[in-house]
């Protein structure tokens, strides 16, 4: 669908620029509408994804749909399950940013792992609130795999505090160190939050490191291509 209007919901303000640039580099020639609500993430951290957050996610998604979005991407993994619930209540495609990454992680781990052990996926996050939603998403994909897959999760201590304090360099260093350590045992490494993606740049590892922005953007564009002209 040429010239499609894309809607994106973020909980980290900087990701609006990240995804805008990413989508424009693909040659997307339609409007891109961004909504930012940092309170969704702070609420999820404080008390989980409760009914209030679910209602707010639905409100934002409905607003984007009413504003003419042909497809919607929510770029926060911590609220992914609320996104799936909202998707069933609007008339346009609504995608969670980490779904494509989860599919790829399990497929790559199964492909790369030696035959004498289970495939291993390492999940890194800077926020504990993200590990539950991402872990459950991965486990749902693991259930369909044709061999055992182990998922190990870890929070990168200090990285979130550094980022919230404006110290992106320390955030990236801590995440980079955690990626390097995880590569010793994992067949695939998953960075659970889109805000972690920059920390993987420049690392020279034999293990694939998957981030959600590219996969999420590709899935969004694929969704609009399937829409009638």
Predicted feature locations:
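Non-catalytic structural scaffold of enzyme domains
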Residues: 1-229
């Amino acid at each position: 669908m040429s010239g499609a209007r894309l809607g994106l919901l973020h909980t980290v303000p900087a990701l609006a620029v990240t995804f805008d640039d990413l989508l424009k580099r693909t040659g997307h020639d339609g409007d891109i509408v961004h909504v930012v609500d940092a309170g969704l993430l702070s609420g999820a951290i404080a008390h989980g994804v409760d009914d209030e957050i679910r209602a707010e996610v639905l409100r934002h998604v409905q607003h984007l749909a009413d504003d003419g979005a042909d497809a919607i991407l929510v770029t926060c993994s911590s609220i992914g399950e609320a996104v799936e619930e909202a998707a069933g209540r609007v008339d346009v495609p609504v995608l969670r940013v980490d779904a494509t990454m989860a599919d790829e992680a399990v497929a790559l781990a199964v492909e790369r792992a030696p035959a004498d052990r289970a495939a291993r996926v390492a999940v890194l996050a800077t926020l504990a609130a993200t590990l539950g939603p991402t872990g459950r998403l991965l486990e749902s994909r693991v259930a369909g795999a044709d061999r055992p897959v182990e998922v190990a999760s870890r929070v990168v201590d200090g990285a979130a505090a550094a980022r919230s304090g404006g110290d992106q360099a320390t955030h990236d260093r801590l995440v980079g160190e955690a990626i390097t350590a995880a590569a010793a045992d994992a067949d695939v490494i998953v960075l659970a939050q889109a805000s972690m993606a920059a920390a993987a740049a420049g690392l020279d590892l034999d293990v694939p490191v998957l981030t959600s922005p590219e996969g999420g953007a590709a899935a969004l564009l694929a969704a609009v291509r399937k829409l009638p002209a």
